[in-house]
């Protein structure tokens, strides 16, 4: 008898409320209203009671048929009762055998539309991996855990939150297929599934290097084959034709690479591989489809004698671009007017330099004014909104991510007339008079081999400004790295810096002001080993990408987030005090999730493409 309790104050209040309502004109209560009055107050020590409730539920509703009120008596929560009752009514038609009934109640199989399904199938009926319900990549879901809180939208498991007539489904990781049904077992019908499995041909693509002996080293610099057609199917122009000879005259070609007939070659050591000139506008070129070995630049190719601690690297800066087409700024790039030019350091750059010697912004902090004078805001004209980040590389050219311009799954296909750039900004929303410059775009150039369909490979685009932008304390270009700088700095454990006005955290909140910063944010992130990057995701990683972020056991946190895309990942060289843009914020699976990292476009890998475009159209 020791567990028997009196009614107590909560019970008295409930009884008083009930008596009051009975004596009023509303003699009968709605079922939900009555149940809410009779609901018992939960106690902290409820382990025994939880077991008792489970026993009651099984006795009342599994061994026998029960009513909504009886289920509520066992569960004591309107929300839990509603969820249970929805499954119970669906599963009632398969009460026997008991095992099938329990499988249905516990969601291990689908009944009717499969609204009850809570299993772990996470591939569609054609074999496509499901997208995480909490993710916005590759598709922005209109259904999520906030819009459908009772639908058990966990991980990337197939569910039917909208009662689709085709059964459980999921958003897919294929950018060309938004959502697709899953093949899940049907309750009480052994061997039958909601839809038939019909795997697509081709299978999955694993993060594997090309087989040894079947790939070209040095990005095809030594290729002597007879391929004379580009990836896009265009025939190559002969190297000794007048257009090709005219264009080659001022190029820094390797004399050891023999330019024979119209065969694809790589005379300028383009990290993209072999290419050729093609007919069309003067200077048109295209890349050729050859199989290149994966060869890391920086990261694994590390020479201890050229380490930061050894200080043996040449500190002299050499320009790379033709000023006539590139514009002004390269000779002075990466030297910030308010810091390096005044021999001052910002508050956190020591963290970067220490990491060199020692071996989307979430959890970032407000940036000091002028800390990233190359930061650009890519702005949509109508509706007026921040679209992406970008970076200033000269007074005429801006660098950003291709997916900021073109990404069909999000209905993105912007032209020069849709966008403008805002340069020199610190505040996210306020117009900064006499500081920021607003510039129109003359032309957008997206990498021709940008792969939005699979993995955002070559996620890079160039924006040509209509007019050169004047430099100031708050407007100054960043440097693009050479091979020596990449080899010295792009090392696992070394930290780079990401800046942007992106979301402060990953969330589905409708109050956007809760997650958007008022000023530019900055975060310093360590580069991650390539095998760890590959192991962290099912998406195929190429050597045009690298990843950065904190590992599960690291005490510090931080990441880029939605809105930071297209912005720069920069590192400061201790040899010449210049800042170099090593990467472009490209993609990630959420923001600052444990075991997940941000992926960045490898700028050096695509530097020759940048040069060719600028030489042709500058």
UniProtKB/Swiss-Prot annotation:
Residue span(s) of the pro-peptide: 25-43
A GO term for molecular function: endopeptidase activity
Taxonomic superkingdom: Eukaryota
InterPro entries: GLA-like_dom_SF, GLA_domain, Kringle, Kringle-like, Kringle_CS, Kringle_sf, Peptidase_S1_PA, Peptidase_S1_PA_chymotrypsin
Chain positions covered by the region annotation High affinity receptor-binding region which is also known as the TP508 peptide: 548-570
Annotated control of activity: Activity is promoted in the presence of negatively charged surfaces, such as polyphosphate and dextran sulfate. Inhibited by SERPINA5.
Identification of the protein by name: Prothrombin
Origin species: Mus musculus (Mouse)
Gene of this entry: F2
């Amino acid at each position: 008898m020791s567990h028997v309790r009196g009614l107590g104050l909560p019970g008295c209040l409930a009884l008083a409320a009930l008596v009051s309502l009975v004596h009023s004109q509303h003699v009968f209560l709605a079922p939900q209203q009555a149940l809410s009055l009779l609901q018992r107050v939960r106690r902290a020590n409820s382990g025994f009671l939880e077991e008792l409730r489970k026993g009651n539920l099984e006795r009342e509703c599994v061994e026998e048929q029960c009513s909504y009120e009886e289920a509520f008596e066992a569960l004591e929560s309107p929300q839990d009762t509603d969820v249970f009752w929805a499954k119970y009514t669906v599963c009632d038609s398969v009460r026997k055998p008991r095992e099938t009934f329990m499988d249905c109640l516990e969601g291990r199989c689908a009944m009717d539309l499969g609204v009850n399904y809570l299993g772990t199938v996470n591939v569609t009926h054609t074999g496509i991996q499901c997208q995480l319900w909490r993710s916005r990549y590759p598709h922005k879901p209109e259904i999520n855990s906030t819009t459908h809180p009772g639908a058990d939208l966990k991980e990337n498991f197939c569910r039917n939150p909208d009662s689709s007539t085709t059964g459980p489904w999921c958003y897919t990781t294929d950018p060309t297929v938004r959502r697709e049904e899953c093949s899940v077992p049907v309750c009480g019908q052994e061997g039958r599934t909601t839809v038939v499995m019909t795997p697509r041909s081709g299978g999955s693509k694993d993060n594997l290097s090309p087989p040894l002996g079947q790939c070209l080293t040095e990005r095809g610099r030594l290729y002597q084959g007879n391929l004379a057609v580009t990836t896009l199917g265009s025939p190559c122009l002969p190297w000794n034709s007048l257009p090709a000879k005219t264009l080659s005259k001022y190029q820094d070609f390797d004399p050891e690479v023999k330019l024979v007939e119209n065969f694809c070659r790589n005379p300028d050591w383009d990290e993209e591989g072999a290419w050729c000139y093609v007919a069309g506008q003067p200077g048109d070129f295209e890349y050729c489809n050859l199989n290149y070995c994966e060869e890391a630049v920086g990261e694994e190719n590390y020479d201890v004698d050229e380490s930061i601690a050894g200080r043996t690297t040449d500190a002299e800066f050499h320009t790379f671009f033709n000023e006539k087409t590139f514009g002004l700024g390269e000779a002075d790039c990466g030297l910030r007017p308010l810091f390096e030019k005044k021999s001052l350091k910002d508050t956190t750059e020591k963290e970067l330099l220490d990491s060199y010697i020692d071996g989307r912004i979430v959890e970032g902090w407000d940036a000091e004014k002028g800390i990233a004078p190359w930061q650009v805001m890519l702005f949509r004209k109508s509706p007026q909104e921040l679209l992406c980040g970008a970076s200033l590389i000269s007074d005429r050219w801006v660098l950003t991510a291709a997916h900021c311009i073109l990404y069909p799954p999000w209905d993105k296909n912007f032209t020069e007339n849709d966008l403008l750039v805002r340069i020199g900004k610190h505040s996210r929303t306020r117009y900064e008079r006499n500081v920021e410059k607003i510039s129109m775009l003359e032309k957008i150039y997206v990498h021709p081999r940008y792969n939005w369909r699979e993995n955002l490979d070559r996620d890079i685009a160039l924006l040509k400004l209509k007019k050169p932008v004047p430099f100031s304390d708050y407007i100054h270009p960043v440097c693009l790295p050479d091979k020596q700088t990449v080899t010295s700095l792009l090392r696992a454990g070394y930290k780079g810096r990401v800046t942007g006005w992106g979301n402060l955290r990953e969330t589905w909140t409708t109050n956007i002001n809760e997650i958007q910063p008022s000023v530019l944010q900055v975060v310093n992130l360590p580069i991650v080993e390539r095998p760890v990057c590959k192991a962290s995701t099912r998406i195929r990683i190429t050597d045009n990408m690298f990843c950065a972020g904190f590992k599960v056991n690291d005490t510090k946190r931080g990441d880029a987030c939605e809105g930071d895309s297209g912005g720069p990942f920069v590192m400061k060289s201790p040899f010449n005090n210049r800042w170099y843009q090593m990467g472009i914020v490209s993609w990630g699976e959420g923001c600052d999730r444990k075991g997940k990292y941000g992926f960045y476009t490898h700028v050096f890998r695509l530097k020759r493409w940048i040069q060719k475009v600028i030489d042709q159209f500058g």
